[in-house]
Design a protein with these regions (language model features):
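Hydrophobic anchor at the beta1->P-loop junction of P-loop NTPases
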Residues: 19
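Hydrophobic positions on the alpha1 helix immediately C-terminal to the Walker A/P-loop
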Residues: 30, 34
């Protein structure tokens, strides 16, 4: 596990965590529980992404955007397809995806710059659900993961299949724009065009988003598993739901870290 040893953990003088996982698995819940004590600093990568993106030409998206209301990020990304159904052209969709990627890289790396400057003792970096799409878990020199691991203990949230099915069901009821790795997105788009035999401007935006979501979930499960294996550790969604304080979370992490290091 890159950068983490039991002795290093036991001799630490701080609790600094980068929490990773798919949207809906409890990153924000955990951050909220830790902030209640007023002794934990919270850094939201999604909020920082918005601050980077919503300038100049995109300044209209700043209206109503806050750390407690991140919905404008999804609105900015949009969905490709029929304009009469709220869709945007695929070229514009790709442009926005690329802007999001650039902003996410900057916002994620900024968390490490902040901790180096402030040296907060209790700090949680609440990463974006798409962080797994901008890193290579198998590369020991991956810039983002290496930087995070040098400043935080990387904790990935995992869940059982029933929980993932619940995420899929909720998404089906209310599909929202997502960020995809570009080659994966283009592959999905081409397969969908062949499947439906439709022109791009006739595609139902929600139908395409739903088409790709289940494949995206399976992809991200594997990516987050590789991140936890190579760069940190994993904790279960059901255990996260029981967290009521920072000390609860620290105890859970210590247990999981010990379990991993003795294997």
């Amino acid at each position: 596990m890159n950068g983490v040893t039991l002795s290093k953990w036991n001799n630490r003088t701080h609790n600094r965590f980068a929490v990773l996982g798919m949207s809906g698995l409890g990153k924000t819940f955990l951050s909220t529980q830790l902030k209640k004590s007023k002794t934990w600093e919270h850094y939201s990568v999604d909020y920082e992404i918005g601050k980077i993106l919503f300038t100049d030409k995109n300044s209209d998206f700043r209206n109503g955007f806050s750390i407690n209301n991140l919905s404008n990020l999804s609105i900015f990304l949009g969905k490709p397809g029929n304009p009469s159904k709220g869709g945007i052209g695929f070229t514009e969709y790709i442009r926005r995806q690329r802007l999001h990627k650039q902003a996410e890289i900057l916002a994620t790396l900024k968390s490490s710059q902040l901790i180096q400057k402030t040296r907060y003792d209790n700090f949680i970096c609440d990463t974006s659900g798409s962080i797994c799409e901008i890193v290579n878990p198998s590369d020991p020199n991956d810039k983002i993961l290496k930087t995070l691991s040098e400043n935080f203990l990387i904790v990935c949230l995992e869940a059982d299949n029933d929980t993932y099915e619940t995420l899929i069901r909720r998404f089906t009821e209310s599909p929202k724009p997502m960020y995809y790795e570009e080659p994966f997105l283009r592959m999905l788009w081409e397969k969908y065009l062949l499947k439906t035999n439709q022109d791009e401007n006739k595609i139902d935006p929600d139908d395409f988003i739903l088409y790709g979501y289940k494949a995206l979930v399976e992809r991200r499960k594997k990516l987050f598993y590789m991140i936890s294996k190579n760069w940190g550790l994993s904790v279960n969604f059901n255990d996260i739901r029981k967290i009521k304080s920072g000390s609860d979370f620290v105890k859970l992490v210590k247990t999981q870290l010990n379990n991993k290091l003795v294997k």
